[in-house]
Amino acid sequence: MPITSLSDYDAPDRILFPKRSNGALVNEQAALDALVDLLDLEVIEVNIFRGISPDENRQRVFGGQVAGQALVAAARTVDHGNIHSLHAYFLRPGDPLVPILYEVDRIRDGKSFTTRRVVAIQHGKAIFNMQASFHHDEPGLEHQLDIPIVPSPLTLPDFRTRMTPYKDQIGAWYDQPRPIDTRYIGRMPVERVGSQEPFQRVWLKAAGTLPDDPVLHACILTYASDMTLLDTTMLPHGMTFWDGRVQMASLDHAMWFHRPFRADGWLLYDQHTPSTSNSRGLAYGSIYTQDGRLVVSVVQEGLIRVTA
């Protein structure tokens, strides 16, 4: 059952997910714990929550953070059922220096489905909105596409190892602990030269262990799903986000949650792009567990603006 109220734990007001007391955490686990804290929200009033951004040198808030926090806000108001779909629009760049208010509209509480609308606000203006739908578990027909045949994530180097040749170019970012472990199958974007096929595959997982709460796992994967996907839209053009001529930003994001999963287990993010045009790129993602279950489908459109 989703955690929907602060009374579920004997903890301070900002706690949604249980904390660990182990002080000997490795860097990645500490980074993951910091992400869990980031996704926790302060209750301001009924249906109103406040989130913060990490103390990082960013010009704007990472879109996955806003989407993950918005899903937390929606889930806080739902008594029963699990998230089965969300549809979101990124309206304005988020300011990382000020908190984000999340206002939840309880659209519908039905017998099988519950619908919520969430608006994220900064400086008196909406920067993001999301519609999320929750569904009671219900038996029915089952089918899915098979997982592609790919190398095991344990045979692939992690992100930091792959980026070692470029560490002088990226500076302090290279040494920063990462809450999400990403392992590319084949070349990473920075390693590619010339036009490529319009698809890529990435293994990802939370870089540590998480509590069992399914709301938390859905929110962590929502955060992570905004990573790497738009890369595919530039593969046919021989360009990457490292190119100084390219401006990239998420415009909208949709997810469908098909089956249970753990975000701290390996997940294959199978990605492809059908089209890029009018300075917008569209990308699809299918997310599989390591044992082959299709658990989430993702579609994202992004701004892909190239300057001369």
Q: For the regions a protein language model found, what residue spans apply to each?
A:
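Terminal targeting signals and extreme-terminal segments of soluble enzymes
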Residues: 2-308
